[in-house]
Amino acid sequence: MGIEEKLPSGVLLSTVEGLAGYMRKASFWPASFGLACCAIEMMTSGGPKHDLGRFGMEVFRASPRQADVMIVAGRVSQKMAPVLRQIYDQMPEPKWVLAMGVCASSGGMFNNYAVVQGVDHVVPVDMYLPGCPPRPQMLIDAILKLHDKVQHTKMGAHRAAEIEELETAALRALPTSEMKGQLR
């Protein structure tokens, strides 16, 4: 016997988190951080053929203070890493990061001293998108998966703990120069 029985039909019960998640997922404002060829595919996804506006991402923001999702598209150089972190820090909470392409995810074919081997060494990444470069359809699919993640993400201390865990894991990660692999 709860409150559900006392309410008239047609009244929807939900949590504030559920409602806020539903609203947040429908109004992503992306900050574009296009660094290489993946940025061309990202721009294509905003055009009339693919129309990201259908998913609430109508305008790519030039200001990080107006954005809540950062799409890092392409390789990140060592000199660009502090700028990327500064832009991430300027974004208001809650914020999410999508690493678009192999270069943003793992450094790609640029396994050298000048390129960061994965943007997750600089900012916490919520979604990785493979491909070189990934097609606009793949970007839209990743955004829809990020929508689902955002809708079911708990607010407040839970999200802060998740970000702290991601940043700690990135700082503890072994530098790529010390890893043994195909290119070493």
UniProtKB/Swiss-Prot annotation:
It is a peripheral membrane protein. HAMAP family: NDH1_NuoB (MF_01356). Keywords: 4Fe-4S, Cell membrane, Iron, Iron-sulfur, Membrane, Metal-binding, NAD, Quinone, Translocase, Transport. NDH-1 is composed of 14 different subunits. Subunits NuoB, C, D, E, F, and G constitute the peripheral sector of the complex. Its EC number is 7.1.1.-. [4Fe-4S] cluster binds at C37, C38, C103, C132. It is found in: Cell membrane. GO terms for cellular component: plasma membrane; respiratory chain complex I. The keyword Calcium does not apply. InterPro entries: NADH_UbQ_OxRdtase-like_20kDa, NADH_UQ_OxRdtase_20Kd_su. One of its GO terms (biological process) is electron transport coupled proton transport. Pfam families: Oxidored_q6. Gene3D superfamilies: 3.40.50.12280. NDH-1 shuttles electrons from NADH, via FMN and iron-sulfur (Fe-S) centers, to quinones in the respiratory chain. The immediate electron acceptor for the enzyme in this species is believed to be a menaquinone. Couples the redox reaction to proton translocation (for every two electrons transferred, four hydrogen ions are translocated across the cytoplasmic membrane), and thus conserves the redox energy in a proton gradient. Its cofactor is [4Fe-4S] cluster. The keyword Zinc does not apply. GO terms for molecular function: 4 iron, 4 sulfur cluster binding; iron ion binding; NADH dehydrogenase (ubiquinone) activity; NADH:ubiquinone reductase (non-electrogenic) activity; quinone binding. It catalyses: a quinone + NADH + 5 H(+)(in) = a quinol + NAD(+) + 4 H(+)(out). Belongs to the complex I 20 kDa subunit family. Its main location: membrane. Binds 1 [4Fe-4S] cluster. It is an enzyme of class 7 (translocase). This is NADH-quinone oxidoreductase subunit B. It comes from the Bacteria.
